Every structure is written in structure tokens, then in C-alpha cells.
Amino acid sequence: MKKSLIALAVLAASGAAMAQSSVTLFGIVDTNVAYVNKDAAGDSRYGLGTSGASTSRLGLRGTEDLGGGLKAGFWLEGEIFGDDGNASGFNFKRRSTVSLSGNFGEVRLGRDLVPTSQKLTSYDLFSATGIGPFMGFRNWAAGQGADDNGIRANNLISYYTPNFGGFNAGFGYAFDEKQTIGTADSVGRYIGGYVAYDNGPLSASLGLAQQKTAVGGLATDRDEITLGASYNFGVAKLSGLLQQTKFKRDIGGDIKTNSYMLGASAPVGGVGEVKLQYALYDQKAIDSKAHQITLGYVHNLSKRTALYGNLAFLKNKDASTLGLQAKGVYAGGVQAGESQTGVQVGIRHAF
């Protein structure tokens, strides 16, 4: 009898420990047929692509209840390509963080979305992916160089506050950790944050960030200010973004760009959603401007599976060479002043 009681106590203790911890395997497989009418050489491109409605991914995440409202967690997530498998070189560059959360909010350490991108890309109706999302967080203008930290950053420390009656904020700092002799100083460094108000149908956010990128081997400041807002009327949702980016260069002068986005989405029959979004990208110093219109529809077959279609049109003016992003098929620009049209039809499954 005594041995039985001891055995039951051990089982109960182990069950409680298991209940306090969890590990989840998750992912999305998103594959589509895509067509782009024109590349930089004037030729059309078509084929099987990936990440049209959501970025295809595979990951592990877990939490441990430490008691007193404190939780530890980890998140490892990498991109996958449903069109060709792309098994070689898999990594966790979408996110690789360890965290602590509680009544004070959440602290994360590791590679992650920078706070400004994490919050403000939520106003993009196409979730910063597919053939025609808002491209303001990328270095789209001539002379801006490589986009190091506009969306994600290595060596990032970030903090997200709890919600205070609708008000919330997030802040982050990424170390540059220069390790290679001869590289530009401070490249990779990020400092920025946002303040937001989310209450019922209304959401509004203001983000400020400075990143160190590299142009011609020289470190360059990328100063970014972004304002985003949305309002859900029930029958439709309106969303908008205003962004100004300034590159401070030692050689060649500063580059100033403005990006604007306005979109609307509406539910269809309880199982679908139609989306229409317009964006303008303007670099006045060299008379470079591009207009972008994207139309999309998502039809949910279940909570985890959906069919979708995207149609995008991009019109460059003057010196602009922007291009649509049909991942797995074509992701490049066109000749200056040329227009481009693209289509994606695909399926997305989450697990």
C-alpha cells in the first residue's frame, strides 16, 4: 500500500511538471503558381512559387511556467520553400529567441523582428509577403545599399510592455558586433521602438528607428519614422501607413524617401476576405516614383487551410526600377520607368 502511494505521488508530480511546460512544432506551407509579365530583360517569368499569402516556415516554440506569473520561453523559426523543398542550408533566421515574460511584459534575446517592423507591418493587408505587399521597410531606392535591419536584426534585445488600457509599446537595441577586419564600423546596429494604442476597432502606432547599413563599404545611418493606423467598421477595415526614411551618407549626399499606403479589406460570406491596397514610393532627389496596386482574395476551407489569389500592378516613373516580389519565380526590378504586372494563385496550410 505504501509503495502504491509513493508511485502515485511520483506520477502526480511528473504530471504537474509536464503541465507547466510545453513544446510545439508548428509551420506553414504556402505554394502557388505565379506569373510576372516582365523582368529586367523584358521577358516574362512563370512557374511554381512560395509564400504568396504567408511566408512558408517551420519552427519550434515552448514555454515553462516558473511560478508567480513568470514564464520562460524559446522560439526557433526558419523559412522553407514549398516549391522546391530547399532542404539544404536550413536555419532559424526568421526568429531564434529566448524570453522571459510576466506582469512586467516580455523581454526577448536573439534574432527577431525589430519592434518597429513587428508592430507596423501589421497594417499591411498583405502581411509583408506575396507579390505586392508594402515595401517601405525595405531599401527600395537607388543608392540605399543593403537592407540589414529594416525588418529583422541579429544580436537583438527587445522589450514589449503589457497593455495599459489599450496603450502598449516595444523597444529594441541590436549590437553591431563587428568581427571582420575591414568591414564598416557599426553595420548591423539597430535602436528603435514604437508606441501604440489598440482598443476595439481602432489601432494606431508611431515608430522611430535608426539602423546602421553599408553603402560602398561605409557605415550609413538609416533613420526611419513610421505612422500606421487602422479602423475596423465590421463590414470593412481601413488601414494606412506613412513612412519617411533618410539615409545619411558621407559620400554622395543624403537620400530621403517617402512611402505611403492605403488599403481596405472586407469579409466575404463568412469564409473569405477581399483586399485592395495602394502604395506610393517617392524619392524626390532623383525624380524617382512608383505606384503599386494590389488586389487579393483569401478563401478559407478550414481554420488551417486556405486558397488565395493575388493580382499586383507596379508602375515606375522616371528613374524608378522597383519590381514585384514573386518568391521562387522572380524577385527583381525592371528597366527605369517600366511597369510590371504579376499574378499568384495558391494554397496555404498551417499546422
Curated annotation (Swiss-Prot):
<keyword id="KW-1134">Transmembrane beta strand</keyword>
<comment type="function">
    <text>Forms anion selective channels.</text>
</comment>
<dbReference type="GO" id="GO:0009279">
    <property type="term" value="C:cell outer membrane"/>
</dbReference>
<protein>
    <recommendedName>
        <fullName>Outer membrane porin protein 32</fullName>
    </recommendedName>
</protein>
<keyword id="KW-0732">Signal</keyword>
<dbReference type="InterPro" id="IPR023614">
    <property type="entry name" value="Porin_dom_sf"/>
</dbReference>
<dbReference type="GO" id="GO:0015288">
    <property type="term" value="F:porin activity"/>
</dbReference>
<feature type="signal peptide">
    <location>
        <begin position="1"/>
        <end position="19"/>
    </location>
</feature>
<keyword id="KW-0406">Ion transport</keyword>
<dbReference type="Pfam" id="PF13609">
    <property type="entry name" value="Porin_4"/>
</dbReference>
<dbReference type="GO" id="GO:0006811">
    <property type="term" value="P:monoatomic ion transport"/>
</dbReference>
<dbReference type="InterPro" id="IPR033900">
    <property type="entry name" value="Gram_neg_porin_domain"/>
</dbReference>
<keyword id="KW-0813">Transport</keyword>
<dbReference type="InterPro" id="IPR002299">
    <property type="entry name" value="Porin_Neis"/>
</dbReference>
<dbReference type="GO" id="GO:0046930">
    <property type="term" value="C:pore complex"/>
</dbReference>
<feature type="modified residue" description="Pyrrolidone carboxylic acid">
    <location>
        <position position="20"/>
    </location>
</feature>
<dbReference type="InterPro" id="IPR050298">
    <property type="entry name" value="Gram-neg_bact_OMP"/>
</dbReference>
<keyword id="KW-0812">Transmembrane</keyword>
<keyword id="KW-0873">Pyrrolidone carboxylic acid</keyword>
<comment type="similarity">
    <text>To bacterial outer membrane proteins and porins.</text>
</comment>
<keyword id="KW-0626">Porin</keyword>
<comment type="subunit">
    <text>Homotrimer.</text>
</comment>
<keyword id="KW-0998">Cell outer membrane</keyword>
<keyword id="KW-0472">Membrane</keyword>
